[in-house]
Every structure is written in C-alpha cells, then in structure tokens.
Amino acid sequence: MNAVRREQRYSSAMKAARYWHLRDDGLIECDLCPRHCRIADGKYGICRVRQRQGDKLIAASYGLICGLAVDPIEKKPLYHFLPGSSVLSFGTVGCNLTCTFCQNFHLSRANRIEGTRTTPEEIAEAAIAHTCASVAFTYNEPIVFLEFAVNTAKVCHERGLKSVAVTNGWMEPEPRKEFYAHMDAANVDLKAFTNQFYQELCGATLQPVLDTLVYIRHETNVHLEVTTLLIPGRNDSPAEIDAMTKWAVSNLGPDVPWHFSAYRPTLQWSEAPPTPLESLLQAKSIAEHNGLRRVHLGNVRIAS
C-alpha cells in the first residue's frame, strides 16, 4: 500500500448527521441502519461515531480520514469495473456491525475518533494527482460516514472521478437510496447466508443485506460485486454455499461477480483456523455449478 500523505491527528470535526428522530421519551433514535440506536445526550451509537449533542445527532468523524492510499481497483476487490485502473482508497473509524473476525478491527472498533482532517476537494485533488480513475470509501463501513462520503462523491463526479463503496450493506432503505445515488460501483460483503451467523458473530441480521444487494442490482445503475469471507466451520459448509449461490443466481443474476476470500486469524479473534485452499475451490465449484459465471478467489495463492 502506497501512502499518499502523512497522517496528522486532530480532534474530531463536527457535522450535523442525517437520518434520526427525537423520540417521545427524550432519546434520539438513529435511523441510519436497522439497529436503530437510542441515544442519550453526550452518548454515541454502537458505531462509535454518531453522537448526540443536545437535541441533535452529530456525525463526529466527518472529514477525519484514515489510511489514504493508492490501490489497484482489483484490491477492493472489483474485477469488472475499470479494470487495470488505480483507485484512491480511504476510510474513517467506526462501524455499525460488531464482527468478531473483523480484519480492520483497529478502525471499526476504535476507541477514539481521530484521523487526518481532509475536505472532499482535497481528496478529489489527490486522486487526480495520483492518476486515479476513482475514489473508494473502504477500510471501515462507509454508511457510518454517509454525509462525508456523499459530499466527497459529489465533488469527485464534478472532477470526472468515479465513486466506489466497500460496504457491509446493512442499512435502512432511505439512507441507502441517498448513498447509492452517488456511487458508481460497490463491493458488498455478504458475510454468510444464515441469520444465526449474523446475530452471533456480527450483532446484526441477514435480510437487510440481501435487500441491499437486490436494491443495488435492480434499482440502480451501480456496478455490483459481492465478497464472502469463508471462515472454517462457520459459513463454509457446502449446504450454505449452495443455498447462497442459488439465491444469488435467482435474485442477482448469473453475471454478478462473486469473490470467495480466505480468512486469516487476527489478534482479536482466532477461534477458527485459516481457510484452506480446498474450501475456496469447493465454494467456487458449487457457485459455478449453480450458474454463477464470474467467481473469483481472494487472499490466497494458487500454484500455476
């Protein structure tokens, strides 16, 4: 990963958040994702970046970015969108899921809101300076910094750049509509195909993610690719892969690109071993047998 600029730390910028309402009991309810956090004054939602201040909800991480880098677009992974081009990638901190196996735990569950204070214009200028064709909202969940992502995407479009989201897809319909109105491509993590997995390992539910996939595919012009991180003994059974890929063909079509990626244990969670190559190859075989035409394997080397 090539660093674009040196990170400097600042206290969080404050920006009014959208998608919330004041309840009769005096709590603010966030309407951004299906969790619907109920937030007391001075407290944060579970994402750790949307904070109540008085009778308003604040997007506390607005304009504070982490990990600014130039990547090949294939690293997102997007194999069928502007292939061979470079993308300027960045994230912030925070996430609306609590995945125990998160590969970017230091960002998604960060205890402090910090980063490099940056404007949408500066991001677009950096992308152009590094001959990137697009900008990617990645590393953490972009829906929790929707306001900054949308504003940045608008500026990027004005400068001739595309906007890319790497996302868990767990969002409510109204913010989803606004968010994807400004995206050109998305890679959505479908973490498993059982509600039990989402509840036990992510603190979430499956159906809203499926709804997002169908929405992107059928109600937008956004290019869609899907990634599933295969965790041994958790979501890699042939029966689950069979059900998942049959659903994909029926609801998203046979041409949706699908990436099966290998899990690697982290310091935070090592309850499963690394994904064996055999599991990835088996998933690919099942997916192709069920009709998916663009199946890729990630985070693994295959001997030629």
Segments (PLM) and residue ranges:
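Conserved AdoMet/S-adenosylmethionine-binding subsite of the radical SAM
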Residues: 120-275
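N-terminal [4Fe-4S]-dependent radical SAM core
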Residues: 4-92, 105-109, 303
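Short, conserved glycine- and acidic-residue-centered signature motifs
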Residues: 83, 116, 202-205, 276, ...
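Auxiliary Fe-S-binding modules of radical SAM enzymes
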Residues: 1-41, 233-304
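Core alpha-helical elements of the protein kinase catalytic domain
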Residues: 31, 93, 97-100, 154, ...
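A generic "binding-loop/recognition-motif" signal
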Residues: 43, 95, 194
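Glycine-rich active-site/cofactor-binding loop and its immediate structural neighborhood
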Residues: 83-93, 97-130
